[in-house]
Amino acid sequence: MNTPANTSPAQHLALNGVSALPHWGVIQAQGEDAADFLHKQLSNDVLLLPVGQSRLAAFCSAKGRMQASLIVVKTAPDTILLVLSLDLLAQTLKRLSMFVLRAKVKMTDATGQWQLRGLLGDRAKVLLGDAAPWHTVEMAGAYAVALYPSVLSNVQVPRALWLAPISKALPEGPELSSEVWQWAEVMSGVTLLTQPVFEAFVPQMLNYESVGGVNFKKGCYPGQEVVARSQFRGTLKRRTALVHSPVSLTPGQDVFTPADPEQACATVVLSAARPDGQGFDALVSGTLESMQKGWHAGTAEGAALELLPLPYPLLADI
């Protein structure tokens, strides 16, 4: 049987193809103030984002808690697309629209106007080669955004987001289930926020400062002071880790350590079954101290979670 740290050749082969992304949606910001408006709302620089390129960003409350995470794609000088979890789209659109005031920008739900597909393995590599995460290639109105790769037994499996108008032909390749895509997302160590963990984390608790999701040099945005203070004062005590579990986990589920059985020390962010049937892998955000004491699902006596190597290095506290 494969150990959690060593994935099987069959799983490598499974991560090659095209997946529908029915759980993601699109918000469109259009107008001459679109970039300036979003720059003042999100954790990353939008003003300096070139047309045809993308960035990861967080949309936070005044207390710095993430209300959504977004893949920001600039398709024209006055048009920006925000790809996010569909279960957060309506409330995110409503809150962003509340801040528009006199800005010359219109925020709309554009999910029905765009096709979203996840590309894995050769399908992603053909379009993007060895491009760094968030690099974007435009092809006659369609966009391929390089995502963080899945890492299986020290082998990187390319991942990409394909975004195109509804009239465009779909990308060719073997059809993959959304469950396989979700597992590949877990194994990349980078995920988009979903409703079960709404306002559960500041961006650094999902490692966003280490994967291009936070710009500490940009101006103010909701929650900016909390996010910056956590980084500059070295007060980060929670991070996201990659784990293997013998049992199924659900986003928002509490995780405990026997050293403190009465209080949850971590939260499940995203979980998916391994394609070979050998258990589950998950992203869990928890205290650095508790990671070393052992995590258990649901209760301190629950199934033990095995820490796996994170696929990327964490940015040291500034």
What spans do the regions from the language model cover?
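Acidic, low-complexity central loop/insert segments
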Residues: 17-20, 25-28, 71-188
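A common structural junction motif
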Residues: 45-46, 97-105, 172-181, 259-264, ...
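Acidic, proline/glycine-enriched N-terminal capping motif
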Residues: 1-67, 76-77
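Anionic-ligand-binding alpha/beta catalytic cores of soluble enzymes and soluble regulatory domains
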Residues: 161-244
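Short amphipathic beta-strand starts and helix->beta connectors
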Residues: 6-14, 57-69, 100-103, 137-149, ...
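Glycine-rich, small/acidic residue-mixed loop/short-helix segments
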Residues: 206-213, 228-318
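Short amphipathic alpha-helix segments
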Residues: 58, 122-140, 248-263
